[in-house]
Each structure stands twice: as structure tokens, then as C-alpha cells.
Amino acid sequence: MEKYIMSLDQGTTSSRCIIFNKKGEVVSVAQKEFTQIYPKAGWVEHDPLEIWGKQAGVAGEALNIARISPEQIAGIGITNQRETTVVWNKRTGMPVYNAIVWQCRRTAGYCDELREKGLDKTIKEKTGLMLDAYFSATKIKWILDNVEGARELAEKGDLLFGNIDTWLIWNMTKGKIHVTDYTNASRTMLFNIHELKWDEELLEILDIPKSMLPEVKPSSCVYGETDEILFGVSIPISGDAGDQQAALFGQTCFNAGMAKNTYGTGCFLLMNTGEKAVDSKNGLLTTIAVGIDGKVEYALEGSIFIGGAVIQWLRDELRMVKTAQETEKYATEVEDNNGVYLVPAFVGIGAPYWDSYARGTILGLTRGAKKEHIIRAALESMAYQTHDVLKAMEEDSGIELKALKVDGGACQNNFLMQFQSDILGVEVDRPEVVETTALGAAYLAGLAVGYWKDRNEISQNWAISRSFAPAMEDEKKEKLIKGWHKAVTKAMDWEEKE
């Protein structure tokens, strides 16, 4: 009986299940979008029960599409939107509030208060992260402080916190297992990435009871088995990693200096720095890349909040395109951006600027500016933001990047990939299997149950679908980058501080 690995890929806008074979090829995919909830400007929430329901649904669907039985699944890997925070009652299994999403800015003011107390330095030293509303810690605190009765329940030991991975595993095991992995823990702003444990001082500062927190384990190990009610059989849950770290693993960036960019809702650049946690002087995050083989490996990360989401905005709000795919056609109908720059700082701007008060802007408009120029400027914004992050990474790590591995939905846009290569001045490699996030989780799960022997076996699965080489003159490139940097400065510090 042929065996497979199931990967549950719980993203920001959809829940997916992908089944992989031994060669790392996609056997089947099932996907369901779920509701985005925007209670106030800058606030973003999800319904944890809807996420769990849809995730369980697509798992069954993917098995049906592949025409395989649950007995043929050797292990399940989970990868998830990181930082998104769920707090639930362990007695009832019910969330006390909606999941507060990574993009949500509601705790920016509280982060400013912590910064005024000089705590940003402590947080960076311990967690490798910037003090920002993006991470889970202040979201947990907000729930405890603002949801009626939550603080009392937490003090009594009745509330559990988890990122989406923890929430899924808890439900898959019928509440038996409350666990996360090193990569997800490293995104909470509560985890000491050097000592590899929850940090008592940070928990005290934020007034978060330790009893709420999950046990932290390696990214590749058997956490437990699914309850039989789910598939009719028990299947080992054996891999867990945050989406960006999973993509780094799926892209087989196993050596220091190897990097990938995922062009999803946001863009996320990660560079493996090996067993050394590199402290960033350029506004990047130091994070855990993977916990495997009895050790952890670290990475530098640049987070770009709005990547592919700018294309959704062109489609849904401005109605300039009917589908995301059309953007490539429009962008190539004009010779250049005609001096138009779009800075998509809809929820502030991330690395290496970190300004919560920046807002989106379109600059350089003249009477000759057309729809095509704005669409092109939107695509180009992803490449410029990637350039800024990559330069910061090279400076911090002292490693010059030779090539960039790419994945995520927008990497299928050939115009964008060519422009990315031009602006970076390095080769951009798109792999055969672009589902690298799900693939990374599958690899972690498969290694834990002996489905794959080791990382060498996995590396042989990686293959290039298309390579893009830089073809732009330096002078033109420098001029474009200069224009972009000018545009970014105009977008910063726009929103009034409360």
C-alpha cells in the first residue's frame, strides 16, 4: 500500500490541505476561503471555529480527490499563519474571542507604552523580535484585559493560548495535546530564542499566566495522533512550523546563507543563518528557522506586510482588474512605471522601516498616468520592498546572496519575477513545486516518521521550473530604487498618533 504525507496549510485567507508523495509532488489539493472580519479600522479577526471546520473539511476533501484512504497517510504536517492568536476555554473548547490576526494593529498604542518604558531592547535581546503589534504577546494581553471574565478564567488556569497550529492540534486530538513548535513559539514575543523557553520576565511584564502557554517541541517529531473521530483511524501528527519557516524548509534552504522569498498576502524573506542567531542592526527579525535533529537553526527575516494583498486591493476595492493574473498583461502594456510609485503601507510598513503610522500612497501621478502604470507600480512595490529587506540581510549576515528562491502565489507572475531579478541584480529561481510552505510541513512530518530518511534525500526533490536573470542597466536600476526610497519617506508617519 503506497503511503503519502498530508499537509494542512492554514493561511491568512484560506485553509488548504495538500497531499504529497515521496518525490515531493502534489497528489491532491483542496482549499476553502474563510471570512475576514474587520470590526474597526486597522483591526483584523478570524473565527477560530470556522477555521477549524474548514480545515477539517478540506482534509477529507483532499483524500477523496486523491482517491486514497486515511490508512495511507504516514503522517500529518501542519503549517500556519503565524502570530495569529487564539484564546479558548479548555473545559468547553470554545474561544473566548475571535482570533486576532497577525495584521491587526489594535495593540500599537500599548506597544508604544512599552517602548517608552525602554522595554524594546529587552524584548529584542530575548526574542529576536521588534516590539510590535504584529506578534502574539500584546494580542493575548488585549484579550485578557478586554474580554469580560477572561482574566479571572486565565488566573484559574482555565484558558489556553495557541497560535493556529496549536489550536488545530488541540482540536485534532480532541483536547488531549496543547503543543507548539520552536518556530511558532519564536513569533509570540514571549519565547527566549537563546534559552529555548518561555521567558518568565516577559510573561510578568505583560501579565500573562504561564499556564495558558503550550509546551514547545521540535518542528519534526510525533506530537500525538488524531482522534479516530476525524478520519476513522489515528494518524500521527508529526510536523509543525510557521508558514514562512516551513517554506524555507520546503525550498531546502538547509545551509547558512540560503534564502527564499514567499510572495503571499505579505512577502516574507528568510535567510538561514545556521546555528548562530545573528542580531540585526537593520530592523530585521532574528527568528528560529527550524527545530530538528536535536538542535535549532536560526534565520534572519524581513516581513513585508502587504505583498500580494496589493493585487487583491486593485481587484476588489479599485476594480482595476478582474483577476490577479491580469496584472501581468496590464503591466507589460506600458514601457515603464512613468514615474508612478505605489507604497502599499495599508497597515503600516514593516522591515526595515517599522513604522506603524505609515499609510498607503500613490506618488508621481501626472496627466499621462494610466491604469496600467498604477497596476505596474503595485507589482513593482513587491520587488522594491524585497530589495530593501535583502540589502539589510546582506549587511547583517555579511553574506552576499547569490540567488533567491521564490514561492507563493505572485511568483507565477513572470513580469514581477523578471523585475525582481533586475532590481536585486541576482538570479531568481522558481521551483517546480511552488507549494513550498505545505511541502516544508510535509517534509518535517515525513522525517519524523521515517517516510524520508534525511535532508539529503529531500534536497534531491528540489528542481527549478524557471530561472530569471538580471537584464537591467545599473543606472536605470539605481534611478528606480532612488525613486522608491523617496516615495517611502513620503508615506511614513502619516497617521496621527493617538
From Swiss-Prot:
Glycerol binds at R82, E83, Y134, D243, Q244. GO terms for cellular component: cytosol. ATP binds at T12, T13, S14, T265, G308, Q312, G409. InterPro entries: ATPase_NBD (IPR043129), Carb_kinase_FGGY (IPR000577), Carb_kinase_FGGY_CS (IPR018483), FGGY_C (IPR018485), FGGY_N (IPR018484), Glycerol_kin (IPR005999). Pfam families: FGGY_C, FGGY_N. Its EC number is 2.7.1.30. Gene3D superfamilies: 3.30.420.40. Keywords: ATP-binding, Glycerol metabolism, Kinase, Nucleotide-binding, Transferase. GO terms for molecular function: ATP binding; glycerol kinase activity. This is Glycerol kinase. It comes from Clostridium botulinum (strain Langeland / NCTC 10281 / Type F).
